[in-house]
Amino acid sequence: MRKILYLIFFIFLIPINVSSENLLIQSTTSTRDSGLYKYLLPKYTYYNDIKIKVIAVGTGQAIKNAENCDGNILIVHDKGRELDFMSKGYGVKRHELMYNDYVLIGPSNDQDISKSKSITDAFSRIHDKKYKFVSRSDSSGTHSAELAVWRRLSLNPGTGSGKWYLESGQGMGPSLNIAVALNGYIFSDRSSWLRFKNKRNHKILYENKQELKNNYGMILVNHNRCSNLNYKYSLDLFNWLSSDEAANHIRKYRLNNQNVFYID
């Protein structure tokens, strides 16, 4: 009995709650699927001392999760929504982490879209010819970027929903599979396409790194709103990911002998 009481007493003397040592990154799926986290996070000094978990969902869902205090750090790619998150007090620090670009994927035997002079030209051709186009339609950063192109054309692809405009409601990988299976077109971030294995007869038909730049922002979630978050550990990881050391690692990360992300 005395041993049991001693054990209970000892447990209560432990100064730090184990759960407070766990860090949760709410992330867009494209960074997780690119393999970046498995490459980058183990290089963090305290990687073996703190359990770091990555939850990968669409940008919209990642932001909602962070608003609900379910995450220490947010890494997404929709600057408008990131700034809105900050303005509402959900975040305390924001850092432009890295960037890559979007590309338009389609059948290798395409004789039309590949001649496009701009992304709006490509989307206009798809709309006019009613080529099958797969949209993620999941409030992700990629989906938001796709919708922005349609808005620039003052077009509403939703009128063709279920006909030529196919809304998957899924992540990048499953959506790419659908586009390939249907011999259709799809707007994707480059890293997801590089890692995608079921390319079959599909390839990049339009690309322009400046026109289709895809910025990833990192936000430190406001610990004053979320008492469950350990600010010390969160800040340290945030600062390391913002450092020149981490930036150099990101620059060196490659898939299929190609750089995946870039630093401004």
Regions found by a protein language model. Name each.
Residues 104:
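Serine endopeptidase catalytic core focused on the charge-relay Asp
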Residues 73-99:
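Acidic, polar ligand-binding/catalytic clefts
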Residues 16-20:
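Sec/Tat signal peptide C-region and signal peptidase I cleavage site
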Residues 4-14:
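Sec-dependent N-terminal signal peptides
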Residues 21-47, 60, 64-65, 70, ...:
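Exported/periplasmic ABC-transporter solute-binding proteins
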